[in-house]
Amino acid sequence: MKSVRYLIGLFAFIACYYLLPISTRLLWQPDETRYAEISREMLASGDWIVPHLLGLRYFEKPIAGYWINSIGQWLFGANNFGVRAGVIFATLLTAALVTWFTLRLWRDKRLALLATVIYLSLFIVYAIGTYAVLDPFIAFWLVAGMCSFWLAMQAQTWKGKSAGFLLLGITCGMGVMTKGFLALAVPVLSVLPWVATQKRWKDLFIYGWLAVISCVLTVLPWGLAIAQREPDFWHYFFWVEHIQRFALDDAQHRAPFWYYVPVIIAGSLPWLGLLPGALYTGWKNRKHSATVYLLSWTIMPLLFFSVAKGKLPTYILSCFASLAMLMAHYALLAAKNNPLALRINGWINIAFGVTGIIATFVVSPWGPMNTPVWQTFESYKVFCAWSIFSLWAFFGWYTLTNVEKTWSFAALCPLGLALLVGFSIPDRVMEGKHPQFFVEMTQESLQPSRYILTDSVGVAAGLAWSLQRDDIIMYRQTGELKYGLNYPDAKGRFVSGDEFANWLNQHRQEGIITLVLSVDRDEDINSLAIPPADAIDRQERLVLIQYRPK
């Protein structure tokens, strides 16, 4: 009966965090709107080989992540849940691997369940795992690869070892097809310290070639297909998306070496109090093969991405699978022997919740700020934000009431965040970051437009997805579409600021022309260097400007 109760609790936990509240959150631009529109266009066109965004070639990522996203929208429709269904599925599959791997290492069902709950409730896992980007997919393939390698190295027969390495190659191949060649580098770096300390080089060299073969065979069909359709894809993807993005002086998302320290700290909530003890206990028990493997899995990717010039929090998502297992193992030891770390964890969550409550008041309409985040008419959103932090502090306090038994309720600290964050976003944020909100407010004006132009790729993708049309024209700025716009068949999909007046005269009689611009909050629309418009509708950071036929 206890096992049944645990399973019911786990399913309720997943429903409250990963299923029920997802539709209440509008899509964020630029990331979610971009991937939503790429997958919508894939379904609409039936082209499952070459990715397109706004009808233009889009070579920033390979294809596999878009396949999964497209299946999500095909199954659940073009809605918020359908867009995020793929990443949620990948996150839950990763959690299932955490369960399986923990059971494999320690043969303890309670520990396996705890590791799963810790993983799913980690702030960084939840934030990224319910956000429609490709990182949950690559995290799943990396975690699957690490599990496959362990399975192969623990097998006692040549058939078992061969199967494990073949599976490793498939996971690496799918990782390459999801986000590129980092799916090869990260697993290799992660296992090398373990291979060295356990002196398992022989197995690696004897069977490793099977992983190489299965990886190549996994990528080859699509790799050849896109090379035939778009011969310059691999050159662009390898040089621009890998070398320039991570290594060169002009790398994207440049950040200092220590960048991931605060990411690890914030990402470990609501289990931050377990982080030092989990790592220390893991290091102290480094003579144990499994512990070394988990430590290497956690630390090596962190070091690799810290050295790289380009950094984003999402890059280290796969590290938190192994970290969750280390935390769960340490938590049970602490509960049994010395619950000090569990008490500290409770106080950290209380402090975080109280700090959030105070910060919410400071930026609320009743706080001391001259320009509050929320306006007076958004009072219910302020109370939603207060509820988020109040629940966080409450469950932090509850874990202290009988710490040896109640410490695991820290998993419920983010419950308010999961259920209420979609209702607490300020209008001033929604107007700039949620194109769906803008479309809803201006639907009647946008729908009959013959041409729609915008100066933001994220807004363009949001407009395209919401209006179910991929002919949005870029105005003044090309952004990440620069490469696709260079193709001859993309002529007419970009209008510069200097050309706009002439372009308007040439196309005005064809129908309503709508210009959607991103502006500063205090920017005077009348100062924009554009021809006089027939209608203007400003929604804070986004403004709709229309020209009708004359």
Curated annotation (Swiss-Prot):
Pathway recorded for this protein: Lipopolysaccharide metabolism; 4-amino-4-deoxy-beta-L-arabinose-lipid A biosynthesis
Transmembrane segments: 7-27, 81-101, 111-133, 137-154, 165-185, 204-224, 255-275, 288-308, 315-335, 346-366, 382-402, 406-426
Top-level taxon of origin: Bacteria
Keywords: Cell inner membrane, Cell membrane, Glycosyltransferase, Lipid A biosynthesis, Lipid biosynthesis, Lipid metabolism, Lipopolysaccharide biosynthesis, Membrane, Transferase, Transmembrane, Transmembrane helix
GO molecular function, a single term: mannosyltransferase activity
Cell location: Cell inner membrane
Catalytic reaction annotation: 4-amino-4-deoxy-alpha-L-arabinopyranosyl di-trans,octa-cis-undecaprenyl phosphate + lipid IVA = lipid IIA + di-trans,octa-cis-undecaprenyl phosphate
Pfam families named in the record: PMT (PF02366)
The UniProt record lists the keyword Cell membrane: yes
Bilayer topology annotation: Multi-pass membrane protein
First-level EC class: transferase
GO cellular component entries: plasma membrane
Matching InterPro entries: ArnT_tfrase, Glyco_trans_39/83, LipidA_mod_glycosyltrf_83
Enzyme Commission number(s): 2.4.2.43
GO biological process, one term: response to iron(III) ion
NCBIfam families assigned to the protein according to its UniProt record, in alphabetical order: PRK13279.1 (NF009784)
Function: Catalyzes the transfer of the L-Ara4N moiety of the glycolipid undecaprenyl phosphate-alpha-L-Ara4N to lipid A. The modified arabinose is attached to lipid A and is required for resistance to polymyxin and cationic antimicrobial peptides.
PANTHER family: MANNOSYLTRANSFERASE YKCB-RELATED, UNDECAPRENYL PHOSPHATE-ALPHA-4-AMINO-4-DEOXY-L-ARABINOSE ARABINOSYL TRANSFERASE
Assigned protein family: Belongs to the glycosyltransferase 83 family.
Protein name from the UniProt record: Undecaprenyl phosphate-alpha-4-amino-4-deoxy-L-arabinose arabinosyl transferase
Organism: Escherichia coli O7:K1 (strain IAI39 / ExPEC)
Gene: arnT
